[in-house]
Amino acid sequence: RNFGIGADGLIVLARDAAANLQMLMWNADGSRGAMCGNGLRCLARFAEANGHTDSREFLVMTDSGPRAVALLDAGRGSGDVRTQMGDVHCGPKRLVEVLGDSYEFICGDAGNPHAVTFVEDLDAAPVERIGAAMQTHPEFPGGVNVEFVQAVGSNRIRQRTFERGSGETLACGTGAAVAALAARQVGNIDGHHAYVELRGGTLLVIGEGPSLAIEGPARSVFHGEVELST
């Protein structure tokens, strides 16, 4: 679950009844995931490299609806990908008591649920402790992806994410979209583009909402075969 062999979840490339490319996703704990922004970029590059599409721009069906993707360079199997995230929404600030302390969250949706809280020191944020507690919080009966965000400059934020079903991950594309929109809501972002720095790299969020797109890299790190018993 770093930069080599391993993963935060499983993505299967399939085709729906209309022969469209389809993304099926499972989290690390085996639960189904409705949408994964980073996974969508990886699936797009995988589809290109393995001959499932000849197009530079195409649709991928997800459990959250169709998503348009665009391969931005001439590389095969690696390079930047732009993904349309659909409509992303954020609600007003709300106070939530977690493990005896009150946290101010902006809750949003990017095809899956997110709760964003802003901190002054991201490195010291209690990501694992609070993120895990939020998964059984009565206000989030289905669990929630939790983003800890620090504003670091003009139209630039840093982010750490505790993903429901996977724990803390190095990056979260849908979380970056919601975090950028939440940062715009509180005045930390005012431009058309926002840069979101994650432990796994930097993503570019394009748009002012509700429709957003994300640009970021996707590259192959390992090929293998696994024999599954029936």
Predicted regions and their residues:
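A glycine-rich beta-to-alpha transition motif near the start of alpha/beta enzyme domains, typified by
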Residues: 1-77, 115-230
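Short acidic-hydrophobic surface loop/beta-edge motif
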Residues: 58-60, 93-100, 106-108, 194-196
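Zinc-dependent deaminase
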Residues: 63, 86-91
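Short, solvent-exposed secondary-structure boundary/capping segments
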Residues: 77-85
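Glycine-rich beta-alpha junction loops
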Residues: 87-89, 110-114, 218
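Short, charged/polar, Gly/Pro-enriched secondary-structure boundary elements
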Residues: 89-93, 221-223
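Internal active-site segments that recognize and position negatively charged phosphoryl groups
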Residues: 96-124
